[in-house]
């Protein structure tokens, strides 16, 4: 996955499911806090915390119908697991944040 200038709005694959609307909205509402926690972990060089947060987001994003967000979180999880340097990890967190910024209900 590459970071691009794509500004296309991302909606959940389940956005038209009335049973999912409220929980998707909650997921989107809580997404900034998840990203903030990841930035705090990155700034503190707490790679284990960052890996855990990315792993959790990877699963949640897929479950709420945001596969691109899940793929970006998986890349962070992978980068930490294989011991990539902070520049690679920081780049992947930036990519995740850019994708998250495109998400709408």
Where are these regions (language model features)?
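Two-component system phosphorelay core
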Residues: 1-105
């Amino acid at each position: 996955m590459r970071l691009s200038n794509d500004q296309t709005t991302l909606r959940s694959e389940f956005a038209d499911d009335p049973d999912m609307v409220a929980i998707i909205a909650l997921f989107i509402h809580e997404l900034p806090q998840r990203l903030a926690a990841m930035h705090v972990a990155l700034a503190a060089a707490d790679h284990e915390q960052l890996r855990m947060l990315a792993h959790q987001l990877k699963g949640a994003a897929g479950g709420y119908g945001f596969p691109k967000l899940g793929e970006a979180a998986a890349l962070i999880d992978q980068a930490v697991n294989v011991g990539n340097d902070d520049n690679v990890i920081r780049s992947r967190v930036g990519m995740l944040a850019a994708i998250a910024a495109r998400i709408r209900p």
